[in-house]
Amino acid sequence: MENIVLIGMPLSGKSTLGRELSKILKYDLIDTDTLIEEMEDKSIKEIFKIYGEDYFREKELEIINKFKKESNKVISTGGGLPIYNKNIYELKKIGFTVYLKVPLEELIKRMVKKEYDTRPLLKNNDTKFLEEMYKNRIEIYEKAHTIICNTNYEESLITIVRAYKKWKGI
């Protein structure tokens, strides 16, 4: 499948880079969190509160399965999507996976800078929780086809496009 799948921690810039990549490549943008909100007609915060995290993770798996037969998409995943149910391996089947690796210190700055009320797992700006999440997820994220370790927006875009073209054999 010829999709780009962006993975990484919450606050790593997946949605922002995804929007720009979709414009550059003329691909449709799919934000998995937004898609789930539309499917459920509820915010993620409400879904977690009413149905729980397991239900939300089932919806993520439904989305992965939906895109197994589609191409020309930039898919921006929720931070936990690759982690659960060994989804990282399923994501690699639907496209070129890109881990946006942002240093923990930068993620903490981003979290503290803005209140992330819509992200149920980041409520209360708990830096210890974010640090623990980072440690628990990094090994799985690093199974992506490529890792982008750049906090510079423009350079990240260029690097992703180059790596994707190389992966496609262009």
Curated annotation (Swiss-Prot):
MF annotations from Gene Ontology: ATP binding; magnesium ion binding; shikimate kinase activity
Gene Ontology biological process: amino acid biosynthetic process; aromatic amino acid family biosynthetic process; chorismate biosynthetic process
Reactions accelerated catalytically: shikimate + ATP = 3-phosphoshikimate + ADP + H(+)
Cofactor(s) this protein cannot do without: Mg(2+)
Keywords assigned: Amino-acid biosynthesis, Aromatic amino acid biosynthesis, ATP-binding, Cytoplasm, Kinase, Magnesium, Metal-binding, Nucleotide-binding, Transferase
The record's free-text note on cofactor binding: Binds 1 Mg(2+) ion per subunit.
Binding site residues for Mg(2+): 15
Family the entry assigns: Belongs to the shikimate kinase family.
Residues involved in substrate binding: 33, 57, 79, 137
A matching Pfam family: SKI
Function description: Catalyzes the specific phosphorylation of the 3-hydroxyl group of shikimic acid using ATP as a cosubstrate.
Chain ranges passing through the membrane: none
Protein name from the UniProt record: Shikimate kinase
Subcellular location(s) per record: Cytoplasm
